[in-house]
UniProtKB/Swiss-Prot annotation:
It is an enzyme of class 4 (lyase). The keyword Ubl conjugation does not apply. This is Probable pyridoxal 5'-phosphate synthase subunit PDX1.2. Its EC number is 4.3.3.6. It comes from Oryza sativa subsp. japonica. D-ribose 5-phosphate binds at residues 42, 171, 232, 253-254.
């Protein structure tokens, strides 16, 4: 999916049942596509937002707590204070995203009302509804949603998601789950491309995904919307890896502002995403960054880690 920027993502034009109050789905997908090839950084203060913008971030995610702190502190994680989000919006000129709990349509309505540029319906926050996601077609603002496999990605797109990201395991500094999820999506798409029409119909039922979206994915050879990597990206090498695996861009959360030199690391990760296929540049930007966030070894049986990615499907 990563490219030289000359190709575009075909827009899904299926019957989404858009209401009169919602924005055109193709417009929302186009807005998300404008972020291709970029880095979206989690920030908790206007000062951090300015650091991210100066480093070259294409957007920021306004939060009260980065995922590492959500893990450490526990409790119920909710939408950030609208006042904080407004302060961050005033401090930068790049787009500002904010997270709503899965299924919490009122949090999403509030975020749209205060003018965020994108809403992330996020498993990193505590679930509000363990059976339903937000009907994103009823909103003008573009939505971002996470996935672990192709079926989950296409279900979110049918609900109106204009951008898909891997779920990974946010706040761990460990990229293994993000790699697993993007490889799962890419592997499913490769298998799909070799199927005939009858097999595609059966496959769509098996993965509980809309047939028209499955067929469009087969024809495109990729998701019908942009796909970013998220969850555990902590180094320039991690970011470049996700781009080489085929992602359109990268979310970086705790990995920047839990490191020794956030401004330097932020610039390095932006450069790594831009030059993801050039090992010499990657070696240069990876040098002298100071200490990375300590991170969590997800395979250590002695450590219990709540799996945010498993909170919904």
């Amino acid at each position: 999916m990563a490219s030289d920027g000359t190709d575009v993502v075909a827009l899904y034009g299926g019957a989404n049942g858009l209401s009169h109050k919602s924005g055109s789905f193709s417009v929302k997908v186009g807005l998300a596509q404008m972020l291709r090839g970029g880095v979206i950084m989690d920030v908790v203060t206007p000062e951090q937002a300015r650091i991210a913008e100066e480093a070259g971030a294409c957007a920021v995610m306004a939060l009260e707590r980065v995922p590492a702190d959500i893990r450490a502190q526990g409790g119920v994680a909710r939408m950030s204070d609208p006042g904080l989000i407004r302060d961050i919006k005033r401090s930068v000129t790049i787009p500002v995203m904010a997270k709503a709990r899965i299924g919490h349509l009122v949090e999403a309505q509030i975020l749209e009302a205060i003018g965020v540029d994108y809403v992330d319906e996020s498993e990193v926050l505590t679930l509000a509804d363990d059976a339903h996601h937000i009907n994103k077609n009823n909103f003008r603002v573009p939505f971002v949603c996470g996935c672990r496999d192709l079926g989950e990605a296409l279900r979110r797109i049918r609900e109106g998601a204009a951008m898909i990201r891997t779920k990974g395991e946010a706040g761990t500094g460990n990229v293994v789950e993000a790699v697993r999820h993007v490889r799962s999506v890419m592997g499913d798409i490769r298998a799909l491309r070799s199927m005939d029409d009858d097999e595609v119909f059966s496959y769509a039922k098996r993965i509980a995904a809309p047939y028209d979206l499955v067929m469009q994915t087969k024809q495109l050879g990729r998701l019908p919307v942009v796909q970013f990597a998220a969850g555990g990206v902590a180094t320039p090498a991690d970011a470049a890896l996700m781009m080489q695996l085929g992602c359109d861009g990268v979310f970086v959360g705790s990995g920047i502002f839990k490191s020794g030199d956030p401004a330097l690391r932020a610039r390095a990760i932006v450069q790594a995403v831009t030059h993801y296929s050039d090992p010499k540049i990657l070696a240069e930007v990876s040098s002298g960054l100071g200490e990375a966030m300590v991170g969590i070894n997800l395979s250590d049986p002695k450590i219990h880690v709540e799996r945010f990615a498993a909170r919904s499907d």
